[in-house]
Design a protein with these regions (language model features):
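Helix-start/capping segments and mature chain N-termini
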Residues: 1-127
C-alpha cells in the first residue's frame, strides 16, 4: 500500500504552474469520491516553485492522501519514443490517478517503446 495513494503531475514553465484549474478539478473530484471528504487545499496556494526550478520546463509531482501531500520538483526529461502500441483495456479501474501504476506497467511489452491505453473507448493514459 502506498503512503500517498494518488498523485498529480503539473507542468511548470518558467516558474509558472500550467493548467491548475484542470488539476484542481481532478484533485477535488478525487477528494470527494476516493477519500469521501471535502477538499480544503488550493493547488495555486501550495504549489510554490523553488528558486532552482524557476527556469525552463519542470515537472511537479504532488503525491497525496486524504490529509497530507508531498511535492517533488524535477527537470522534465523527454523520452525518445520511436514506436507506440494501443492497448484496449476495460477491466482496469482508472477513475483516479493512482500512485500504484503496476497494472498499467504490466501492459508494457518488448514490441513498442510506449503503450497508449484505451479505456472504455477513450485514450486515457500512457505508461
Amino acid at each position: 500500500m502506498f503512503l500517498f495513494p494518488l498523485f498529480e503531475t503539473i507542468a511548470i514553465i518558467d516558474g509558472k504552474p500550467q493548467n491548475l484549474a484542470y488539476h484542481q478539478a481532478r484533485f477535488e473530484h478525487a477528494m470527494r469520491n476516493y477519500f469521501q471528504i471535502e477538499p480544503k487545499l488550493q493547488l495555486a496556494e501550495v504549489v510554490q516553485v523553488p528558486a532552482e526550478h524557476q527556469q525552463g520546463l519542470v515537472r511537479c509531482r504532488m503525491d497525496y492522501s486524504a490529509h497530507h501531500f508531498e511535492l517533488t520538483f524535477f527537470p522534465y526529461q523527454p523520452r525518445q519514443i520511436q514506436t507506440l502500441q494501443c492497448v484496449y483495456v476495460d477491466e482496469i479501474d482508472y477513475r483516479f490517478k493512482y500512485s500504484d501504476r503496476s497494472q498499467l506497467e504490466a501492459l508494457k511489452n518488448d514490441q513498442s517503446d510506449e503503450v497508449v491505453i484505451v479505456h472504455q473507448g477513450y485514450v486515457s493514459d500512457c505508461t
